[in-house]
Amino acid sequence: MNITQIIEKLKQNEVVAYPTEAVFGLGCNPFSQSAVEKLLILKQRPREKGLILVAPKLDYFFSFIDKEQINSQHWQKLQQTYPRPITWIVPAKKDIAKFLCGNFNSIAIRVSQHPAIKILCEQTGFALTSTSANLSGIAPCKTSDEVRLQFGADFPVLDMSVGSATKPSEIRDLFTNQLVRQG
């Protein structure tokens, strides 16, 4: 599908596949419980685990993160450019929907410069949920053709290339810098 069709699907609270820095991600509108529920069912992902949000700028995350708990050093860390993609675990707003953060009082966010993420967020006006495009036990998809093989020929997938990263993003706690997932 082209970018316009994918944007329409996202606005209609559908789940789509789009390229990220290393693999294809499955994403949807994080403000829509029905969209997130579809994503969790499709991915067979336990609700308790929570989801990652991606966007080209921090502003897209302000509806989800507790800005009061983040000091100037933490903001610098979030705004810094790194040689590889880093997902940060940050404090979530107290009223955040549990379908996004699972059993946690935090949420994972990643500022991404991938052109697809930039265009999709700018055109929809929201961050995207991001979980790797693969069924349980199968390697994440690196091409749109692989997505169609796993999820069906009619699955809405953006026909663009993934970035140059060879591994999915590492995940770190913003406050402790503890490595949660190796990238």
UniProtKB/Swiss-Prot annotation:
Gene Ontology CC, one term: cytoplasm
This enzyme's EC code(s): 2.7.7.87
Keyword set includes Nucleotidyltransferase: yes
GO molecular function terms noted in the UniProt entry: ATP binding; double-stranded RNA binding; L-threonylcarbamoyladenylate synthase; tRNA binding
Catalytic activity: L-threonine + hydrogencarbonate + ATP = L-threonylcarbamoyladenylate + diphosphate + H2O
Main location: cytoplasm
Protein's cellular compartments: Cytoplasm
Keyword DNA damage listed: no
Record keywords, A-Z: ATP-binding, Cytoplasm, Nucleotide-binding, Nucleotidyltransferase, Transferase, tRNA processing
InterPro entries: DHBP_synth_RibB-like_a/b_dom (IPR017945), Sua5-like_dom (IPR006070), TC-AMP_synthase (IPR023535), TC-AMP_synthase_SUA5 (IPR050156)
One Pfam family of this chain: Sua5_yciO_yrdC
A single GO BP: tRNA threonylcarbamoyladenosine modification
Residue intervals of the YrdC-like domain: 1-183
Family as reported in the entry's similarity comment: Belongs to the SUA5 family. TsaC subfamily.
Stated role: Required for the formation of a threonylcarbamoyl group on adenosine at position 37 (t(6)A37) in tRNAs that read codons beginning with adenine. Catalyzes the conversion of L-threonine, HCO(3)(-)/CO(2) and ATP to give threonylcarbamoyl-AMP (TC-AMP) as the acyladenylate intermediate, with the release of diphosphate.
PANTHER family in the record: SUA5, THREONYLCARBAMOYL-AMP SYNTHASE
HAMAP family xrefs: TsaC
Protein name from the UniProt record: Threonylcarbamoyl-AMP synthase
